Amino acid sequence: MATLTEPSSSLSFTSSHFSYGSIGSNHFSSSSASNPEVVSLTKLSSNLEQLLSNSDCDYSDAEIIVDGVPVGVHRCILAARSKFFQDLFKKEKKISKTEKPKYQLREMLPYGAVAHEAFLYFLSYIYTGRLKPFPLEVSTCVDPVCSHDCCRPAIDFVVQLMYASSVLQVPELVSSFQRRLCNFVEKTLVENVLPILMVAFNCKLTQLLDQCIERVARSDLYRFCIEKEVPPEVAEKIKQLRLISPQDEETSPKISEKLLERIGKILKALDSDDVELVKLLLTESDITLDQANGLHYSVVYSDPKVVAEILALDMGDVNYRNSRGYTVLHFAAMRREPSIIISLIDKGANASEFTSDGRSAVNILRRLTNPKDYHTKTAKGRESSKARLCIDILEREIRKNPMVLDTPMCSISMPEDLQMRLLYLEKRVGLAQLFFPTEAKVAMDIGNVEGTSEFTGLSPPSSGLTGNLSQVDLNETPHMQTQRLLTRMVALMKTVETGRRFFPYGSEVLDKYMAEYIDDDILDDFHFEKGSTHERRLKRMRYRELKDDVQKAYSKDKESKIARSCLSASSSPSSSSIRDDLHNTT
């Protein structure tokens, strides 16, 4: 299987490098760069690109409407590069010469959807023969700790490109994106495999489909969710594979067929929006709504009004965890429907609870949301981004109750995501100790950090904040290790939240610099003597800028404290008497 950084020479006559969604720039060997043929082809590619990117070169003779936006294209180029377009344009015999023909992209796609950015990326390859870097605003998420190599926006972007490449018949792109998706399957969360499975099924990508089916079959994904999400024949294959290779009974307890049948009836009643039937089935049977995972199922698949009616029955626990360690709010976060989030919070759902791998509902939402949806400013009278609304609602709820952080469930292993989040928090708190020692100590005392053990990573020691295997307790089981690390993470999150609430200016400085220094061991004396002369000079310059910002933040926090002191002084007896005198004179 190809890796994400594998060059694909078949994709580009200019030897473009096709790496992960950051996805690098073009690389040329010295011998290729001096080859006149390669130079000519590179020049041709750049010139053709101008037809797409330069508004002064708008000589298009047709338009393709994508997400309501017309994209100018040149039929001769599309026909030469794609058999689909060649056949499409052959059928057009009577076209008015006074106006450009218009085509709806959604009418070309029998399945799937391709957004505007994905189609422009596809067109760029059609015109230039080169694969450019993925646009970060739609191929990354807004979780600052994520490496973006297998988050949902990264997967969704490649899935869209696969639909476009398959339906519009560009086989070399199909081959390349199939390798990319195969790599995602083993790295991402199992729920993120489902859109990959669907594109593999629709585009008849047998190898990719088999890999997806195998991954889902060996997971603990809920049987009824699988039946809801995938075609019946695929669901049956997954069921048969699970029978052949039974799952671990500790993580997936055995459920009788009779019980499954009763649960199925309850969930079908939810599918039909028949709340009265749901109530009747629950009343007449010995199964509770929690045992059927009814609330989890409803917040994902039911209409928001139906969800509100189900919650009004008060027959389920909104903080109940399913066998995978997800609460109802975690599932609602995947749905990204603000009204459902609010309904759950009104019923007492805890926004600060974690999954077994250390993610809260906000973390889940951020991993699902791309920067375009999160940062785009909505014009007056236009609909806001639902994902952004959900994130704002949950973050406000956490800020209202910053100290309500329950210890999360513990899994038998420590996922990579938990390690990344811990390293981020350790670096942030460590940086706060360097520049705001007094404030950091107060926040750490509130968070009870001293009562937990520092996380320094599990990899062999190399530099900075990496791990030391000699310090590992060999008597500690994986379950104990995960519990210890989750406790540490809760303490660090309490510390950060306390800092945000009571020392806002210092927190703003940390926010600004954490993004820049997240991949550097800044806490190790800033490593001033590492790197080239130019790099060391830049580090010193950035250090001086950081010192200035720290001093400003310290002054602002100090001014805030003085202002609060003055405010409290204004309520003293003497000031009260002055106010009374003024009142009496009036």
From Swiss-Prot:
Location(s), subcellular: Nucleus
Residue ranges of the region described as Salicylic acid-binding core (SBC): 383-523
Feature: compositional bias, Low complexity: 565-577
InterPro entries per UniProt: Ankyrin_rpt, Ankyrin_rpt-contain_sf, BTB/POZ_dom, NPR, NPR1/NIM1-like_C, NPR_central_dom, SKP1/BTB/POZ_sf
Biochemical pathway: Protein modification; protein ubiquitination
Null allele phenotype: Elevated PR-1 expression level and enhanced resistance to Hyaloperonospora parasitica. The double mutant npr3 npr4 accumulates NPR1 proteins (while NPR1 transcripts level is normal) due to reduced NPR1 degradation by the proteasome; this leads to a reduced growth of the compatible pathogenic bacteria Pseudomonas syringae pv. maculicola ES4326 after inoculation, but impaired hypersensitive response (HR) and subsequent systemic acquired resistance (SAR) induction when infected by the avirulent strain Psm ES4326/avrRpt2.
Ranges of residues in domain BTB: 60-135
Cellular component, GO annotation: nucleus
Domain of life: Eukaryota
An MF annotation (GO) of this entry: salicylic acid binding
Positions of salicylate binding: 428
A biological-process GO annotation: response to salicylic acid
Functional note: Salicylic acid (SA)-binding substrate-specific adapter of an E3 ubiquitin-protein ligase complex (CUL3-RBX1-BTB) which mediates the ubiquitination and subsequent proteasomal degradation of NPR1 in response to SA. Together with NPR4, acts as receptor of salicylic acid to monitor immunity in a NPR1-dependent manner and induce systemic acquired resistance (SAR). Involved in the regulation of basal defense responses against pathogens, and may be implicated in the cross-talk between the SA- and JA-dependent signaling pathways.
PANTHER family: REGULATORY PROTEIN NPR3
Record-given protein name: Regulatory protein NPR3
